Amino acid sequence: MSLNKNQFLDNFQNILSAQFTGTQNWWTKSLFHFTDIKNAISIIENGKIYSRNKVIELNLMQNDNANDSVILNTNNEYKNYVRLYFGPSTPTQKNNEGIKPKDKIFQNAHCPIPIMFVFDFKKIFLLQNIRFTDGN
């Protein structure tokens, strides 16, 4: 029996939900994008979250949150998409967030004041032209 997209998403959410318990369970109904407050202001002003390549092209990035080696090792095609996460707390976020002295910033990865954007899981996954990766 083949599943339509809605059925597939319901099954996928149930699988995710089984991995999160208690107060974390609501995460499975959302997708997350974090960035520094300076970039968040630009996102709100423009009403859009652009891909890494597009934000560089439009000169909109106020603060580059990313680790240089992660970006260097990310396929350029993936930089044409907005990076969203299944949970609001990722190793990347934990390593990069917070106001830090320069000697504590590793490979330019710094997100002094993180802002989290939260999106409806199903609405995003029902959009055309979305992609999944299992990492960077």
Residue ranges and their predicted role:
Residues 2-136:
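Active-site-proximal loop/hinge segments that shape catalytic or ion-binding/gating pockets
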